[in-house]
């Protein structure tokens, strides 16, 4: 990776207003931006976390996540995307304020009506109905992104001391066949399903997750 060979985008500022911020890369490869102000440095960190989290649930039942400070503060998978959003919000409606919202399927008008009640920075989905877009555009600064089908980077890079750390991305997802029952009482099939679901959330949580 050579920053000098990448497209550079000057951000409003870095993590704090007194810090300069830049993005090297092509966001247009990943998103179509339909509405709202420009993404900030902190927005990009949250959006990156949101996209990587939802990648774990690609092609599954309607799933909705609300992120704050790079972590999911609400998450649900339900029969409809509206119910997934409502239940994700119920996880922590306080932290959801000003958060990043992401869905793994199209957002319809009913879901947009619910979202519109919340102050949120960014909404991400693979598509939106025309009615949903009209509702979500009701807030001038709300950023509305359409996520494209794209391969995400297979390596993670960060600076450390006077150099750079590089590691392979964690693509391992636990399966039922990987589990060993270490207790006298074995979990039920539903409990195993819940544990595997939770493990994908834990994998994408930046803390000592339990």
Where are these regions (language model features)?
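Active-site loops and adjacent core secondary-structure elements that bind or stabilize anionic groups
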Residues: 1-133, 139-171, 191-209
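Active-site/ligand-binding-proximal alpha/beta "capping" segment
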Residues: 174-190
């Amino acid at each position: 990776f050579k920053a000098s060979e990448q497209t550079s985008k000057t951000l409003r500022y870095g993590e704090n207003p007194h810090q300069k911020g830049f993005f090297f890369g092509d966001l247009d490869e990943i998103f179509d931006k339909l509405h709202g102000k420009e993404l900030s440095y902190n927005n990009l960190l949250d959006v990156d976390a949101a996209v990587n989290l939802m990648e774990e649930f690609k092609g599954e039942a309607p799933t909705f996540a609300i992120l704050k400070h790079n972590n999911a503060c609400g998450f649900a998978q339900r029969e409809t995307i509206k119910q997934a959003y409502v239940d994700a919000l119920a996880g922590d409606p306080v932290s959801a304020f000003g958060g990043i919202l992401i869905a793994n399927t199209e957002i319809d008008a009913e879901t947009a009506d619910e979202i519109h009640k919340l102050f949120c920075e960014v909404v991400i989905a693979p598509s939106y109905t025309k009615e949903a877009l009209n509702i979500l555009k009701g807030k001038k600064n709300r950023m509305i992104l359409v996520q494209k089908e794209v391969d995400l980077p297979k390596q993670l890079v960060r600076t450390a001391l006077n150099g750079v750390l590089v590691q392979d991305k964690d693509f391992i997802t636990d399966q039922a066949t990987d589990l060993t029952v270490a207790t006298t009482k074995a979990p039920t099939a539903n409990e195993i399903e819940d544990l595997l679901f939770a493990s994908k959330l834990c994998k994408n949580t930046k803390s000592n997750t339990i």
